């Protein structure tokens, strides 16, 4: 040989090579059936390991076309510089690519495959029978697949799907469902992460112990705030209930006094008018009677006087009785109306207090981001009310609540509140 040329072959490969009639030669015309190792880039030096041509049907030659490339196995092909193809039908088409295993394919620069039927694209690594990966991906395990860039799939039949770039699937049949994710199962196969240390940074995972501690702390704070809010609400309700009751009583007393004054004034006015009318009528009749008596004084003085006196007595008595009767009827009617108004007012007060009690029984949501629906009943004396409401806790400090109460007929009471804590 005109130039130094070094070949390093593993013990297994040397044993395989020399178990058959292989030889070294400087002959450009030699054909190769199972093994071919290319010379270096100097065209004057062609050092090869070969076996005399024995063609199978369709051809079984190994082909190392790239500089410093190696092809071992029937129909193995190393097409680019420093490529290695080992195994029947293996193909290494990229620079520095390695395909080991029957029908394995390293189809890009620096791609590496190991396993029967495995496939790797540029800068990818596929280890395991039928494992496959796209550019810059890593697939380890039988039938593991990486169809997205810069992703990793480890485990039997694990899979990183198309467009799920920068994702990782770990475990038997694990599958990803989005970008930038780590999957240890799939929709119907869930796994647990065990022996997980407590997280210390914002981007660390939280274990169950940490979660329980935070839940207990949150519940404690919620109970404390709930007690404070309940106390404030009860105080407010008590003050408003007392104020409402006092206002109702005052209004009832005012209405009663007004009605009584009106009745008295009207009764006095009617009585006075009736009396004046009676007196006027009596005086008129008396004058008429007296005139008639004077005309007939000579012939019927005694009879006329008797008749006049009788008529006057009857007329005055009837007019007076009628005036008193009308006055009594009017007064009774007004007092009856007053009683009805007082009864209605009393009923409205009872319904208002029952509605207030029902609204106060509604709950406020305690969970952050939770919406609640609540219902309650209330009663006061013989009146009852039903209340419904809803609330929403925006965060730990802010909450909203609204409710409406119905006490029958058209008696409806409602409220709404906004709560902020610090």
From Swiss-Prot:
Residues 331-369 are annotated as: Outer membrane translocation of the passenger domain. It is found in: Cell surface; Cell outer membrane. Residues 370-422 are annotated as: Translocator domain. Residues 26-330 are annotated as: Surface exposed passenger domain. InterPro entries: Adhesin_Head_dom (IPR008640), Coiled_stalk_dom (IPR008635), OM_adhesion_Yersinia (IPR008126), Pilin-like (IPR045584), Serralysin-like_metalloprot_C (IPR011049), YadA_C (IPR005594). GO terms for molecular function: collagen binding. The chain crosses the membrane at residues 369-379, 383-394, 401-407, 411-422. Residues 1-25 form the signal peptide. Keywords: Cell adhesion, Cell outer membrane, Coiled coil, Membrane, Plasmid, Protein transport, Signal, Transmembrane, Transmembrane beta strand, Transport, Virulence. Gene3D superfamilies: GSPII I/J protein-like, Serralysin-like metalloprotease, C-terminal. Homotrimer. NCBIfam families: YadA_autotrans. This is Adhesin YadA. The gene is yadA.
């Amino acid at each position: 040989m005109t130039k130094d040329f070094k070949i390093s072959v593993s013990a297994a490969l040397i044993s395989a090579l020399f178990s058959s009639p292989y030889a070294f030669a400087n002959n450009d015309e030699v054909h190769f059936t199972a093994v071919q190792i290319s010379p270096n880039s100097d065209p004057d030096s062609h050092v090869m390991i070969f076996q005399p041509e024995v063609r199978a049907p369709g051809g079984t030659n190994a082909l190392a076309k790239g500089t410093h490339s190696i092809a071992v196995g029937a129909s193995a092909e190393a097409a680019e510089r420093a490529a290695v193809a080992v195994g029947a039908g293996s193909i290494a088409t990229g620079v520095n690519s390695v395909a080991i295993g029957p029908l394995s394919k390293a189809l890009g620069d620096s791609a590496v495959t190991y396993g029967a039927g495995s496939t790797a694209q540029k800068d990818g690594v596929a280890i395991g029978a039928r494992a496959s990966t796209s550019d810059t991906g890593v697939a380890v395990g039988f039938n593991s697949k990486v169809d997205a860039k810069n992703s990793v799939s480890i485990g039997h039949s694990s899979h990183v799907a198309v467009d799920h770039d920068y994702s990782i699937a770990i475990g038997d049949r694990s599958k990803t469902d989005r970008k930038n994710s780590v999957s240890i199962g799939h929709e119907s196969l869930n796994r647990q992460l065990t022996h997980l240390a407590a997280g210390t940074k914002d981007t660390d995972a939280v274990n169950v112990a940490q979660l329980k501690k935070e839940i207990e702390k949150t519940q404690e704070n919620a109970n404390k705030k709930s007690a404070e809010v309940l106390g404030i609400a009860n105080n407010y309700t008590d003050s408003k209930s007392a104020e409402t009751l006092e206002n109702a009583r005052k209004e009832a007393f005012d209405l009663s006094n007004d009605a009584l004054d009106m009745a008295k004034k009207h009764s006095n006015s009617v009585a006075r008018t009736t009396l004046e009318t009676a007196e006027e009528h009596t005086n008129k009749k008396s004058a008429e009677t007296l005139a008639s008596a004077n005309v007939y004084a000579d012939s019927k003085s005694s009879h006329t006087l008797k008749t006049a006196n009788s008529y006057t007595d009857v007329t005055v008595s009837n007019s007076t009785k009628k005036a008193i009767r009308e006055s009594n009827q009017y007064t009774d009617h007004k007092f009856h109306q007053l009683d009805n108004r007082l009864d209605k007012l009393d009923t409205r007060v009872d319904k208002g207090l029952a509605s207030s009690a029902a609204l106060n029984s509604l709950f406020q949501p305690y969970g952050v981001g939770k919406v609640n629906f609540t219902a309650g009943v209330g009663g006061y004396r013989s009146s009852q009310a039903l209340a419904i409401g809803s609330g929403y806790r925006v965060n730990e400090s802010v909450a909203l609540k609204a409710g409406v109460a119905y006490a029958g007929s058209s008696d409806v009471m409602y409220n709404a509140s906004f709560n902020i804590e610090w």
